[in-house]
């Protein structure tokens, strides 16, 4: 991995922990340039990408697809439900096949934590791996689009007071963001149900009731309640969760005028956030979705740069 004259080159992108601060800022800057229409698109028609999603996805899957098409790559169709996976084919063998066919970039979402390790360690698989989300592990492209959204608003990260709120233990978005935001100098706070908090987060920030800090926040990053990863003992009624931990109208009014609200989506309306606040003036949820395309264009370009360096 390298950065030369703001040109980022990556072999893979699987975890925010593997990126330097310089690479992070380079990807954010490049995403911003794509958004502003300042980048001349090269002829990438000889490059193939495959989006291998083994969990449901709308924003990540489709924004990668849009990004790949905007860059002129050829995108291979893949549907896990109609693939050889249903005949017992492993993830490794699926990616091995894609690589053998000449696919250069595999964007993968999979329910297994760290699924990517066996792929990037393989001496046979030559495709570059972009992690579109692994279980409760990492979600680097979501983190980068979140960073772009924050940077557009404030122009820096150092000293910003940012609360990450909700289903922390099960959230790959939370883990990716807390790791890099701490490194970039942000002051982090966490809140949500105690059973969805882990002491491993203590090294990144402070666990605090939202009502004690909300009027000081620059960024309120809400997380989806991940019902699919819970057992019955962890359930709340929608009303109870919203009242205790959600962004209600009363809490919204206490935010600073300059504060912004974020959410990786999909949003459980009237659970994590009151329905009418999803598109409120302080909300940047739609902006995050739009920024996803441009950041993912920057990621794909960086992967192609890295592959060209190794030719």
UniProtKB/Swiss-Prot annotation:
Carbamoyl phosphate binds at residues 59-60, 109, 139, 142, 265-266. PROSITE patterns: CARBAMOYLTRANSFERASE. The keyword Lyase does not apply. GO terms for biological process: 'de novo' pyrimidine nucleobase biosynthetic process; 'de novo' UMP biosynthetic process; amino acid metabolic process. L-aspartate binds at residues 87, 172, 224. Disulfide bonds: none annotated. InterPro entries: Asp/Orn_carbamoyltranf_P-bd (IPR006132), Asp/Orn_carbamoylTrfase (IPR006130), Asp/Orn_carbamoylTrfase_sf (IPR036901), Asp_carbamoyltransf (IPR002082), Asp_carbamoyltransf_Asp/Orn-bd (IPR006131). Pathway: Pyrimidine metabolism; UMP biosynthesis via de novo pathway; (S)-dihydroorotate from bicarbonate: step 2/3. Its EC number is 2.1.3.2. Keywords: Pyrimidine biosynthesis, Transferase. One of its GO terms (cellular component) is cytosol. It comes from the Bacteria. It catalyses: carbamoyl phosphate + L-aspartate = N-carbamoyl-L-aspartate + phosphate + H(+). GO terms for molecular function: amino acid binding; aspartate carbamoyltransferase activity. Belongs to the aspartate/ornithine carbamoyltransferase superfamily. ATCase family. Catalyzes the condensation of carbamoyl phosphate and aspartate to form carbamoyl aspartate and inorganic phosphate, the committed step in the de novo pyrimidine nucleotide biosynthesis pathway. Heterododecamer (2C3:3R2) of six catalytic PyrB chains organized as two trimers (C3), and six regulatory PyrI chains organized as three dimers (R2). This is Aspartate carbamoyltransferase catalytic subunit. The lineage of its organism: Bacteria, Bacillati, Bacillota, Bacilli, Lactobacillales. The gene is pyrB.
